């Protein structure tokens, strides 16, 4: 081997070897235990970022480790290739989304290969290819036939100038991102999949996901939002109309002081006929952004309708208001308001000077003070007539029973979860396989006409989807009858909801999945991805698996056994103020910093000598210009160094702070390992290790080696604390560096240690380990080498170091035989001069002995 560690030379050679040998290509082997490790597939944005590198390095470490355990390991990769960014980029670059996307895929694929990830490239998929989305279209038609797909009108963001639908991210301060026109809410027909039909399964099966983060499961439980409550019907005063609301707090029912309805509610429309101001307010509500997050944070506004509902238990009139925070598509489109015991209702009532009536006592039995906020805790009822004195549960049931008995209430289980709207009024997505006949009948596209292919040779104007602007595309025939194709495309979450299953049989053309392959590999054993996908992608991912199970395509209930959510990658961010006071962000690679004695940045200047403000560490992003290009780091330090830093700098699920000094440290460690191997191999052949003739020092080093193997095995396999595994290997290498190399046995022990270290480092730094394994004359390639096994006998200690205390203060440390009795330890302790000094002339009243660790003598 050469003397210097030169990653730029060895990494390309090793990657070529893997490619030629098809090292990571796998097939189903029924007699072999399988392991399916999957990282969330990337969107082909053009370049990898450090978040990608972290995600895929974690997956690769786990995959390589499992291969070394002798398992048949599948680790595939592909491209989540549809989506809105491609449309914007196509307009900007005067091209079409398809060529832009395919060019990005080619570039990013090369980047992934440079990082040495062990993918089975024969299984690569791109979700924008017809051979992929045809089966998604086929499956959608089957769901339609089962009654799990339906069409209904739903609100979207509409730009009246461009006559187009806008995604939430295209609405900026209530205006169209392109033409700055005020955006409206518009109801248009859209396709939905009945995820609510699976709400109970999705909720209950969370309990079976023992190896998923509790945080993700909690977020999904909250998103599904199962609640038990009562649907209550109010009469409307001086009218035949009825008004229904749903509540999970019937115990507060006697505190209702008003009812709020959505702008789209029939009562709102009825009242607006004779109230122009109300009609204007309803129109304003229609211009509210559709996203639920926006609804939660926007200013709450309302207007009285002049109508009143009759409280069904006390006969009082309560005003009916239109409120912008009530949505028609949620529940009944109306809510009962109890401002005494709901904070949103309290804020609204305070703003509009509406009555606030307390009906729940504080825990100490006192009446609540509602002057500053609502009292939202549960407690005993008062101000509630016949229900006074009841606690929450008794009050809930008594009022619910009374409402049911009067025929104006019905106990119901409700869900916060809403059916999945899969229609997108965009071009760059999979066409929805539905069509409309001349008589208006809507039918699924016949199987022999699938896939409905998205035309790729299009001109983007940045406004209208080419599918909608070209009326010829929609024209087709069914059984000789003219028909029009659906011009909406699927939500891109559709593609990412089942890709993991298609990886098991990407070339299969007889159906959506090859049952034999799918049921060999599934479920995924380890899934890796960001916590930001907890409720959207990971919910649809679980839902689709259950749909495929019920269609007979898979046999398991859940798609992934174990989930690891890696933390974000942070980097320093710097800016200066522009002429208009705006922040202009400067890349950290263009900034020179000065630090104080504690390493804190105290001064920063950019390449032009301009003082810049240090804004702290934040997530790497384009907006703050603080992303670090992985390719530059690989060219500078090598892929192995970047991978090692990524796994060592922080626990996998925590945020990682990018520090180039840390990258340099990882590089120095690999150089040190290389140098130790170079010096060792330079001394010629090694004799066999004879463990029966080892000296105490040699036994100690070998004990440390096998303890390290045991720890690293547990850290990678069970605990997934990869950073502590690397730290243990580093500590072992420090001990090896201090060990003598004179005798044959010294060198034989060094050989055993280095061969084990190379295998333990291999999942993290595969290129350098491949090369070192050959230099150390390991058997075969390290790619097929078994994981090292800790020798239990080697870990047994002949002696123990025991701390001796007198009255709780340390007075000495003694070495005793590992199997020494308490009596023998006491005798040995008494021989220590300092211990003997404190025992002279006193009586030992009590002895506390922790075997092999501590002896405390209590004297008086």
From Swiss-Prot:
Disulfide bonds: none annotated. The lineage of its organism: Bacteria, Pseudomonadati, Pseudomonadota, Gammaproteobacteria, Enterobacterales. Gene3D superfamilies: 2.20.28.290, 3.10.20.590, HUPs, Isoleucyl-tRNA Synthetase, Domain 1, Valyl/Leucyl/Isoleucyl-tRNA synthetase, editing domain. CDD domains: Anticodon_Ia_Leu_BEm (cd07958), LeuRS_core (cd00812). This is Leucine--tRNA ligase. GO terms for cellular component: cytosol. It is found in: Cytoplasm. A motif ('HIGH' region) lies at residues 42-52. The keyword Secreted does not apply.
């Amino acid at each position: 081997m050469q003397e210097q560690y030169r990653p730029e030379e060895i990494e390309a050679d090793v990657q070529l070897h893997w490619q030629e040998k098809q090292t990571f290509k796998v097939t189903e082997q029924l007699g072999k235990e399988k392991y399916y490790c999957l990282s969330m597939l990337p969107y082909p944005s053009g370049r990898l970022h450090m978040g990608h590198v972290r995600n895929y390095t974690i997956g690769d470490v786990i995959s390589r480790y499992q291969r070394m355990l002798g398992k048949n390991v599948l680790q595939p990769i592909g491209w989540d290739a549809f989506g809105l960014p491609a449309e914007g980029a196509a307009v900007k670059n005067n091209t079409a989304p398809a060529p832009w996307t395919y060019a990005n895929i080619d570039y990013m694929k090369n980047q992934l290969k440079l990082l040495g990830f062990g993918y089975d490239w024969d299984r690569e998929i791109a979700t924008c290819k017809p051979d992929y989305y045809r089966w998604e279209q086929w499956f959608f038609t089957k769901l339609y036939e089962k009654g799990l797909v339906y069409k209904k009108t739903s609100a979207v963001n509409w730009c009246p100038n461009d006559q187009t639908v806008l995604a939430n991210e295209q609405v900026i301060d209530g205006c169209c991102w392109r033409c700055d026109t005020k955006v409206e809410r518009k109801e248009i027909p859209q396709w939905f999949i009945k995820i609510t039909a699976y709400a109970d399964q999705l909720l209950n099966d969370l309990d079976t996901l023992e190896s998923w983060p509790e945080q993700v499961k909690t977020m999904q439980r909250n998103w599904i939002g199962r609640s038990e409550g009562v649907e209550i019907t109010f009469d409307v005063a001086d009218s035949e109309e009825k008004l229904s609301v749903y509540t999970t707090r019937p115990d507060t029912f006697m505190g209702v002081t008003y009812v709020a309805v959505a702008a789209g509610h029939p009562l709102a429309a009825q009242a607006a006929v004779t109230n122009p101001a109300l009609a204007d307010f309803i129109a304003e509500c229609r211009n509210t952004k559709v996203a639920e997050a926006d609804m939660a944070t926007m200013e709450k506004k309302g207007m009285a309708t002049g109508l009143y509902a009759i409280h069904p238990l006390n006969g009082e009139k309560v005003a009916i208001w239109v409120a912008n925070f009530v949505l028609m598509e949620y529940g009944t489109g109306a809510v009962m308001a109890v401002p005494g015991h709901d904070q949103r209702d309290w804020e609204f009532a305070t703003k509009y000077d509406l009555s606030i009536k307390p009906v729940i006592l504080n825990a100490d039995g006192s009446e609540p003070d509602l002057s500053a906020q609502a009292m939202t805790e549960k407690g005993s009822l008062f101000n509630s007539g016949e229900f006074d004195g009841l606690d929450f549960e008794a009050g809930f049931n008594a009022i619910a029973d009374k409402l049911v008995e009067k025929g104006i209430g019905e106990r119901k289980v409700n869900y916060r979860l809403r059916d999945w709207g899969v229609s997108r009024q965009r071009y760059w997505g999979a066409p929805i396989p539905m069509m409309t006949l001349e008589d208006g009948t809507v039918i699924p596209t016949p199987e022999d006409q699938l896939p409905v292919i998205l035309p790729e040779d299009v001109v983007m104007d940045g406004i209208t989807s080419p599918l909608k602007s070209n009326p010829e595309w929609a024209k087709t025939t069914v059984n000789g009858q003219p028909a029009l194709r659906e011009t909406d495309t699927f939500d891109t979450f559709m593609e990412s909801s089942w890709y993991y299953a298609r990886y098991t049989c990407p070339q299969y053309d007889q159906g959506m999945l090859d049952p034999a392959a799918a049921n060999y590999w599934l479920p995924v054993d380890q899934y890796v991805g960001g916590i930001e996908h907890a409720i959207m992608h990971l919910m649809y991912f679980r839902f689709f698996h259950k749909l495929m199970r019920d269609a007979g395509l898979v046999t398991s209930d859940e798609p992934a056994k174990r989930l690891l959510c890696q933390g974000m990658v942070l980097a320093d961010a710097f800016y200066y103020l522009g002429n208009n006071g705006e922040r202009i962000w400067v890349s950290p690679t263009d900034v020179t910093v000065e630090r104080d004695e504690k390493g804190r940045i105290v001064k920063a200047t950019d390449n032009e000598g301009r003082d810049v403000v240090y804004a702290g560490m934040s997530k790497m992003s384009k907006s703050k210009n603080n992303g670090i290009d992985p390719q530059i780091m690989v060219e500078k330090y090598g892929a192995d160094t970047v991978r090692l830093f990524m796994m060592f700098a922080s626990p996998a699920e925590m945020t990682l702070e990018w520090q180039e000094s840390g990258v340099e440290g990882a590089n120095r460690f690999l150089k040190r390992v290389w140098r130790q191997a170079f010096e060792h191999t330079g001394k010629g052949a090694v004799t066999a290790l004879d463990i029966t003739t080892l000296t105490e020092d040699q036994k100690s080093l070998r004990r440390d080696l096998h303890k390290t193997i045991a720890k690293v095995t547990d850290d990678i396999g069970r605990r997934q604390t990869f950073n502590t595994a690397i730290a243990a290997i580093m500590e072992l290498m420090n001990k090896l560096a201090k060990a003598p190399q004179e005798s044959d046995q010294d060198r034989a022990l060094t050989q055993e240690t280095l061969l084990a270290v190379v295998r333990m480092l291999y999942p993290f730094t595969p290129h350098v380990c491949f090369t070192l394994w050959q230099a150390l004359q390991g058997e075969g390639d390290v790619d097929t080498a078994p994981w090292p096994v800790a020798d239990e006998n080697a870990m047994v200690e002949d002696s123990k170091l025991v701390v001796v205390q007198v009255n709780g203060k340390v007075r000495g440390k003694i070495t005793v035989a590992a199997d020494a009795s308490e009596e023998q330890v006491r005798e040995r302790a008494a021989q220590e001069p300092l211990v003997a000094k404190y025992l002279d002339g006193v009586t030992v009243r009590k002895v506390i002995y922790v075997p092999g660790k501590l002896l405390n003598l209590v004297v008086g």
